A protein has these predicted regions:
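N-terminal Rossmann NAD(P)H-binding glycine-rich loop of SDR-like oxidoreductase domains
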Residues: 3-25
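Non-catalytic, hydrophobic alpha-helical segments
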Residues: 12, 70, 145, 159, ...
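Glycine/proline-rich active-site loop of Rossmann-fold NAD(P)-dependent oxidoreductases
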Residues: 168-175, 202-211
Length: 214
């Protein structure tokens, strides 16, 4: 499978990229800093590092050409300003979806977060407070960005992991259709390594397009 990865140098993104390469997939990492990507990921016969900005529609479309799936593991820096108010995804996601789908990619996996949008209906009271107070700026940005790309929904799979940790993964991670989730206790946490596994599982099945997962 040919995978275009956005956010390949992030803490979750590089884990995903390594796992995809270990499974024998061909990966194109579209990155702002190619030197950082090479240092972090190393050279690999199935890895192509393409430098480019997320707002460079022409370059992103070129990188998307011939890919089976796009996986976005983008995230903004956790600064006080971002927590209060953010437009990071609103400014980028519409451009990304237009460029990628315009190049013929029919499956786009987006890493979102548990508690974003309608997923908050299944959250516990403590988790709802986290979503509406602590993470308000970032989560509101994601919701507004999603509203800007509804025309691409048939192509999109969203993953909604809980609070990410840097602990070793447990393995054997399962993904669930978000529509089947009724209630989750406490504040869910998951290792980034397990999230990377889940994202790859979702990406490998094109029939997952149009479905949200937990």
């Amino acid at each position: 499978m040919k995978i275009l990865v956005l956010g390949a140098t992030g803490r979750t993104g590089y884990l995903f990229t390594r796992k995809a390469l270990e499974e024998g997939h061909t990966v194109t990492a579209y990155v702002r800093n190619p030197d950082k990507a090479l240092t972090l990921l190393g050279a690999h016969q199935n890895l192509t590092i393409v430098p480019g900005a997320l707002n460079d529609a022409e370059q992103l479309a070129a990188a998307s050409s011939g890919q089976d799936v796009m996986v976005s593991i983008l995230g903004q820096k956790a600064t006080v300003r971002e927590f209060l108010s953010s437009t990071f995804m609103q400014e980028r996601l519409p451009l990304i979806m237009e460029a990628v789908t315009g190049a013929g990619v029919k499956h786009c996996v987006l890493m979102s977060a548990y508690g974003v949008g309608d997923t908050v209906r299944t959250a516990s009271l403590p988790m709802r407070l986290v979503c509406k107070v602590i993470m308000r700026g970032i989560f509101t940005d994601k919701v507004k960005a999603d509203a800007l790309v509804t025309e691409y929904q048939p192509y999109i799979s969203r993953a909604h992991p809980g609070r990410l940790t840097d602990k070793p993964g447990k393995g054997g991670v399962k993904v669930f259709d978000m529509a089947s989730v009724k209630r989750t206790p406490g504040i869910p946490t998951i290792a980034r390594e397990d999230v990377a596994d889940a994202l790859l599982t979702i990406a490998k099945n094109p029939q997952n397009a149009g479905t949200d997962f937990w």
